[in-house]
Amino acid sequence: MEMLSGAEMVVRSLIDQGVKQVFGYPGGAVLDIYDALHTVGGIDHVLVRHEQAAVHMADGLARATGEVGVVLVTSGPGATNAITGIATAYMDSIPLVVLSGQVATSLIGYDAFQECDMVGISRPVVKHSFLVKQTEDIPQVLKKAFWLAASGRPGPVVVDLPKDILNPANKLPYVWPESVSMRSYNPTTTGHKGQIKRALQTLVAAKKPVVYVGGGAITAGCHQQLKETVEALNLPVVCSLMGLGAFPATHRQALGMLGMHGTYEANMTMHNADVIFAVGVRFDDRTTNNLAKYCPNATVLHIDIDPTSISKTVTADIPIVGDARQVLEQMLELLSQESAHQPLDEIRDWWQQIEQWRARQCLKYDTHSEKIKPQAVIETLWRLTKGDAYVTSDVGQHQMFAALYYPFDKPRRWINSGGLGTMGFGLPAALGVKMALPEETVVCVTGDGSIQMNIQELSTALQYELPVLVVNLNNRYLGMVKQWQDMIYSGRHSQSYMQSLPDFVRLAEAYGHVGIQISHPHELESKLSEALEQVRNNRLVFVDVTVDGSEHVYPMQIRGGGMDEMWLSKTERT
């Protein structure tokens, strides 16, 4: 039997779990693990410049691949710096395992140097936290951590490791468990047959049905089953911000994103529907607006693997607890047996109404402006990448422009902080994606506010040769804050103008990368093409685009209104 120290057990456990990359930053409490990483080998470690970025990188990897991202940080400030990244992953149900160092067990509770209660601090934003107290427990705890992170509704798991249990002088037998189970945790994956049959019958009988798809559909990997179901029943589809890509955006039945900045046709279809078939969604406030006015005539069918998400905000008339992929497979089997296809004549009038809403062309903008419109930047990017890039974003107007003007036809291509809305997410997430998928085109869409939250990771990108394209929509404002101030606060721009911005091109060059400035509309196509060519030649390129600072994101739902109440421009509302 192999004899290993606690630190060596950590590394061997990661290897036995199939982990290839770890993102982290060393410190006193985890130096034994870092020494084991060096001596044992087998794992690529990415040395970040800030622990928050380490978590975002692991998060980006997890979103793009479906694998569990792994982070290693030291105790005290190393652990607390990771919290924002952990909370970001928690809100979006992303599987992570975060290994945090801790002071020796004999010092816990005595305010030792770099001590903090990581289990207590992280508890509200993790799926589970472990404090490992004995060296021999390390393999079993890590096996449980990965299983918890990836199963059911995924999420981050923290494993807190006191320094003394990692002692390289203390060797114990290493046994990697073949399987793991937890008596109090057994997520339901197969849907109830009776409920599925009721849901299908309700869908077939509907006159104004709509399918509402969220991030849970991407997690479940049900895009093919979803497409087959939707096409068989001729159903219109809307997606949440997190669900973009679960159903092809260029498909004729796709109506785009719904919610606060959703398309006119998506929001109107939701509001007027008589049946809503919700797949892997939370019905969060950014998609419902005023619950008292929400979809007043709709029967709600809701599939979700997390029973606590069903009827939490919107009551489900037919709840189905289970994995979305398995439930849709069950539904397709039932559909084939009963041949219960939606007669086209039954919802022809509904589709005619939807096409009238679609004809409103809610995403049109001024294409002849002398200033660069942010919408044009995203559309050009989509065209030049043939819609096949992995796109990460930060948070703000640029995030909404990317969501609306870059149609995603594949899952896991759109990577953003939807729930927590974390500025500074985009760049490190892009680096995590590129680390996992080196042959793919990876683009970070950001803004002059967000990019400065984690811009130090340009150094990490250089060290590990991670050629991504960074597109900075520079409007010299905190754009979304300014938009709200324009619309709600009578144009009082309190602390939303970004003074003393750096020269981003020269800053990128100082970090060892290529910087490109775009200031005029006629430069957009050629310089973005040049940037993508440089990326293909293994260079990170930072493109600073001077965009129209007065531009707003539309549509925008009216605060306190129903799904059908929107601003379509600065002067037009429904």
From Swiss-Prot:
Its EC number is 2.2.1.6. It comes from the Bacteria. Its cofactor is Mg(2+); thiamine diphosphate. Keywords: Amino-acid biosynthesis, Branched-chain amino acid biosynthesis, FAD, Flavoprotein, Magnesium, Metal-binding, Thiamine pyrophosphate, Transferase. It comes from Escherichia coli (strain K12). SUPFAM superfamilies: DHS-like NAD/FAD-binding domain, Thiamin diphosphate-binding fold (THDP-binding). It catalyses: 2 pyruvate + H(+) = (2S)-2-acetolactate + CO2. Thiamine diphosphate binds at E51. It is an enzyme of class 2 (transferase). Sensitive to valine inhibition. Residues 397-477 are annotated as: Thiamine pyrophosphate binding. Belongs to the TPP enzyme family. Dimer of large and small chains. It holds the Pfam family TPP_enzyme_N. This is Acetolactate synthase isozyme 3 large subunit. One of its GO terms (cellular component) is cytosol. E.coli contains genes for 3 AHAS isozymes: ilvBN, ilvGM and ilvIH. The gene is ilvI. The keyword Membrane does not apply. GO terms for molecular function: acetolactate synthase activity; flavin adenine dinucleotide binding; magnesium ion binding; thiamine pyrophosphate binding. FAD binds at residues 153, 261-282, 304-323. Binds 1 Mg(2+) ion per subunit. Binds 1 thiamine pyrophosphate per subunit. Pathway: Amino-acid biosynthesis; L-isoleucine biosynthesis; L-isoleucine from 2-oxobutanoate: step 1/4; Amino-acid biosynthesis; L-valine biosynthesis; L-valine from pyruvate: step 1/4. NCBIfam families: acolac_lg, PRK06466.1, PRK07979.1, PRK08979.1.
